[in-house]
């Protein structure tokens, strides 16, 4: 059984993509349980280094950021900031709407949108969305009393280390959690002007991340089995396979970071 932390088969219907959280065709939605497992294991690897403070989570291939928004709701106390980037402007627009749902103003705006759709069309799905939105609003109002999660998005090619370094401006990244492009619904968009490399796009992303991470950063990546997630500058902390996908947790070799 691959799940060690998200072992409970709970009902995540209130968090379904397209109900309250925004979704669009062509933007895959990482399963809530899988995202939770990836994050929880990353936290465990941090705890093994005696690191327990709320962390900054970064996704260099954030897409619509559905998984980042649900992580915020379900792991609020463990997250200080969420940063996402993508090369696709449409993805970033969708991501902004989803991350706005981590704010009272954003959830109120979404409730108003759903109410308008319900009044206009009266579909059962709209009634379900209204009920779920009220659940999320109540949950969020309790969470923001604890602290707020800072969210930021920017446009960048995940394989361009210089661009990532410029945009992140030296801010520490504690956990990188990403679902890299694969399959028929999404794909890598490596610019034609990118330097030639023998690495795969996923390998180039890992190479680029070396410019913005520290030896304590935990990288959690999910990809299809055809994409290798090995890189000589990283050591593997853990791995599991789930259907046609595999998930790995990595950390940079300390000597690599020291020599950057």
Regions found by a protein language model. Name each.
Residues 1-260:
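Class I S-adenosyl-L-methionine-dependent methyltransferase catalytic core
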């Amino acid at each position: 059984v691959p799940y060690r932390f998200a072992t409970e088969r709970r009902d995540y219907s209130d968090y379904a993509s397209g109900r309250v959280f925004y979704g669009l065709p062509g933007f895959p939605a990482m399963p809530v349980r899988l995202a939770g497992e990836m994050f929880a294991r990353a936290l465990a690897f941090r705890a093994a280094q005696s690191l327990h403070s709320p962390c900054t989570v970064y996704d260099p291939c954030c897409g619509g950021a559905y998984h980042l928004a649900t992580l915020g709701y379900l792991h609020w106390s463990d997250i200080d900031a969420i940063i996402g980037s993508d090369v696709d402007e449409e993805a970033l627009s969708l991501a902004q709407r989803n991350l706005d749902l981590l704010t009272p103003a954003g959830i109120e705006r979404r409730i108003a949108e759903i109410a308008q759709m319900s009044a206009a069309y009266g579909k059962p799905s709209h009634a379900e969305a209204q009920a779920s939105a009220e659940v999320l609003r109540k949950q969020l109002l309790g969470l923001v009393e604890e602290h707020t999660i800072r969210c930021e998005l920017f446009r960048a090619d995940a394989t361009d280390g210089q661009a990532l370094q410029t945009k992140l401006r030296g801010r520490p990244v504690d956990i990188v959690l990403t679902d890299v492009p694969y399959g028929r619904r999404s794909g890598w968009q490596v610019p034609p002007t990118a330097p030639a490399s023998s690495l795969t796009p996923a390998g180039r992303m890992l190479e680029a991340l070396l410019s913005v991470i520290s030896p304590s950063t935990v990288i959690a990546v999910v990809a299809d089995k055809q994409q290798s997630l090995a890189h000589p500058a990283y050591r593997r902390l853990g791995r599991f396979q789930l259907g046609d996908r595999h998930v790995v947790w990595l950390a940079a070799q300390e000597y690599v970071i020291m020599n950057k």
